[in-house]
């Protein structure tokens, strides 16, 4: 491998990282657009669900995610809650 090959290889890898960066940016932009187009009630729904879950489990507000996906004529409400890990049995007693 000569020095010229080394620089050619570096150029190829830069193109690869540029395409990866572009793809990631497209994902972020599409996610932001999807959030803007969501129903107006989602923030209130998220807050109320968080209050209900907190009656039973201590949950971080960032651990609740509410999304609406469109599948043809149907809308699907997706709710994800990351629950805290259980403590050991001996520590609770």
From Swiss-Prot:
- Keyword Cell cycle present in the record's keywords: the answer is yes
Which GO biological process annotations does it have? cell division; regulation of division septum assembly
Cited Pfam families: MinE
* Keywords associated with the record: Cell cycle, Cell division
Q: Which domain of life is it from?
A: Bacteria
Q: Which family does it belong to?
A: Belongs to the MinE family.
Query: NCBIfam families, from UniProt?
Result: minE (TIGR01215), PRK00296.1 (NF001422)
Function noted in UniProt: Prevents the cell division inhibition by proteins MinC and MinD at internal division sites while permitting inhibition at polar sites. This ensures cell division at the proper site by restricting the formation of a division septum at the midpoint of the long axis of the cell.
Q: What is this protein called?
A: Cell division topological specificity factor
